[in-house]
């Protein structure tokens, strides 16, 4: 049997009872939980530079622990010198065990490594309890070696929850250890 994931264990033991008491849920299934985490990286230069795409795929795969999918342009846009079908980014969706492992690494290791870090914005919710976090550099993850990086690139991390409101989503992420700015 596999060892339990630390973040999942914390959710079941501490977070569920706390949220059930805070929001007066009568049923355990009403308590919000994280359904998936999506990591997305747009690559503007990928249409001209295929090497940038390969490097980005390798980096996101190392960070997420799972191979990303290449996203392609749906239609041509002359102003951006873009043709339909040209690679424009990479995305990966994490669920279950990998999702909890990634969230644990993000909260406890990666975010504290950001320079001048004072917490993440509490306003980045979408109105339905989902949270999106933009990172400016990939070097905050310990899986990425400084020497192997050709260019500093950011990424978007979306944490999708089953929460109905932003308040519930914020309470869930705060209970899991997300460091929100005061």
UniProtKB/Swiss-Prot annotation:
Superkingdom, natural source: Bacteria
GO molecular function: RNA binding; rRNA binding; structural constituent of ribosome; tRNA binding
Keyword rRNA-binding in annotation: yes
One Pfam family hit: Ribosomal_L5_C
Gene Ontology CC annotations of this record: cytosolic large ribosomal subunit
HAMAP family hit by this protein: Ribosomal_uL5_B
Alphabetical list of PANTHER family matching this protein: 60S RIBOSOMAL PROTEIN L11-RELATED (PTHR11994)
Name recorded for this polypeptide: Large ribosomal subunit protein uL5
Originating species: Gloeobacter violaceus (strain ATCC 29082 / PCC 7421)
